[in-house]
Structures are given as structure tokens and as C-alpha cells.
């Protein structure tokens, strides 16, 4: 079952990502193959069963499909600021015939969207938090943390800058090129990468596991929220 909602007026940030939506899948495959998808799904088979799942900045829906397969019967809320990205996610879900759960699509800018408090036992933000400058990132994490149920899991996959050379130089060059491209084509607000760890820790989340890939450029995280969910392992 699929439901949709649109909240608020589209921002420049939302509208600009619409143009990339039809091309995002082939661009990802051309530049990274299946590496990003492996990061998105790194912990899906390890985390406890989730009943209420929040996917923010989901984009073209590849993690959404896998969550529907892994957590059948769960309720999923998929939020994205780009209507065209949401359309891609809907199409992918229908094509994979994975809609065996309740999926609600919400067209909203996360900076202006207020989720239900203490509701979701799984939050996922894959290749999304890198879109924000520092003050925006702090607001986004604070807002999403309110939505986390006690003991919730927070999965995130993203880029990072390794601490050691020559990996550090390589990652800096790649990220510089990426930010130039996305700032030019999408009016991305961030000029550089801001690690979310500090803000997650402030909200009571603790890093449970981290996997790195691609010479340290990519990482997949499993964070755990404060409190007990009753089914954490």
C-alpha cells in the first residue's frame, strides 16, 4: 500500500534536484558501480526487526526497496525534497513489486518538516547528510532525533575524509570535484563535508558499528539511540 503527501512549497534546493532525478541511477552506476548500494544496505541484515522506518533523503529508492524486502509488514515513511526523486522511488518500488508494506511518500524539505516524536525504531539517512552546511546539519539531526523511538537504530552511509595519507589527499580531491558539481547543478548549500558524529552524540546516539570502503572514502554506520527498545541485540 502506498500513500503520498506534499508539505509546504518546494524550495530551490528541492526543485534543483528534480533535474538530476531521471539520470541519478546511471550516473551512480557509471561513477561507483554498486559501491554506494553496498554501503546503504551494509547493516540491514544485522539490525533488529523494525516496525516503523523513516527514510530521509532517500532519493531514487534503492534502500527503500531493500527495506521493504527485509522488514515485511513494517510501516515506512519516505521523505525527500525532490518530487522527481520520489517519483523515481515509487516507480522502482512498483517495478520490484516490493510494496508488501505500508509506504508513505512525503514531499518535504527536512529543514521545515516535523516528524512524529518518539515513533521510528529505524532511521536511515544515506548519502544525504553531506548535503548540509554545519548549522543546517545540526538542525536536521536534532529534528530527526526527536522522531527516534527509545533504542532506535540510525543507519547512515556517506563520504568521509580519512585521517592518513595518501587516502586523505585522494578523498579531498574527489569530494572537491563532487561539491563543485552538485553546487553548480543543484544549488547544494554545503561547500564542504561536515561529519555528523558530534551532533549524533549530542542527541544521545552512540556508534555501534562502522564499515569503511573505497580507501576510506565511504563509510556505513550503525548508530544506536538512548533507551531500550526491547529487541536490540
Residue map of PLM features:
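A short glycine-rich, Lys/Arg-flanked "PGG" loop and its adjoining helix->strand segment in the class I
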Residues: 138-150
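Class I SAM-dependent methyltransferase SAM/SAH-binding core
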Residues: 54-55, 59-112
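Conserved alpha-helix/loop element of class I SAM-dependent methyltransferases that forms part
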Residues: 33-50
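A short acidic, Gly/Pro-enriched loop at the edge of an enzyme's catalytic core
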Residues: 113-123
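N-terminal, positively charged/glycine-rich alpha-helical extensions of SAM-dependent methyltransferases
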Residues: 1-22
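A short SAM/SAH-binding and catalytic strip from SAM-dependent methyltransferases
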Residues: 122-136
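C-terminal alpha-helical "lid/dimerization" subdomain adjacent to the S-adenosyl-L-methionine
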Residues: 157-203, 210-211
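Core SAM-dependent methyltransferase catalytic element
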Residues: 203-205, 211-233
Amino acid at each position: 500500500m502506498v500513500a503520498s503527501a506534499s508539505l509546504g512549497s518546494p524550495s530551490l534546493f528541492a526543485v534543483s534536484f528534480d533535474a538530476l532525478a531521471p539520470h541519478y541511477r546511471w550516473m551512480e552506476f557509471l561513477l561507483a558501480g554498486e559501491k554506494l548500494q553496498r554501503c546503504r544496505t551494509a547493516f540491514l541484515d544485522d539490525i533488529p526487526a523494525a516496525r516503523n522506518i523513516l527514510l530521509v533523503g532517500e532519493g531514487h529508492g534503492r534502500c527503500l526497496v531493500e527495506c521493504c524486502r527485509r522488514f515485511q509488514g513494517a510501516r515506512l515513511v519516505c521523505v525527500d525534497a525532490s518530487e522527481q526523486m520520489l517519483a523515481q522511488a515509487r516507480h522502482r518500488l512498483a517495478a520490484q513489486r516490493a510494496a508488501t508494506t505500508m509506504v508513505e511518500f512525503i514531499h518535504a524539505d527536512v529543514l521545515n518538516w516535523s516528524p512524529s516524536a518518539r515513533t521510528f525504531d529505524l532511521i536511515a539517512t544515506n548519502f544525504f547528510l553531506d548535503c548540509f552546511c554545519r548549522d543546517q546539519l545540526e538542525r536536521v539531526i536534532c529534528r530527526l532525533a526527536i522522531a527516534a523511538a527509545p533504542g532506535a537504530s540510525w543507519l547512515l552511509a556517506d563520504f568521509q575524509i580519512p585521517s592518513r595519507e595518501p587516502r586523505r589527499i585522494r578523498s579531498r580531491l574527489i569530494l572537491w570535484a563532487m561539491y563543485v558539481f552538485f553546487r553548480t547543478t543543484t544549488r547544494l548549500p554545503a561547500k564542504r563535508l561536515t561529519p555528523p558524529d558530534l551532533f549524533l552524540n549530542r542527541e544521545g546516539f552512540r556508534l555501534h558499528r562502522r564499515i569503511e570502503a573505497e580507501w576510506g572514502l565511504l563509510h556505513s554506520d550503525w548508530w544506536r539511540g538512548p533507551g531500550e527498545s526491547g529487541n536490540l541485540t
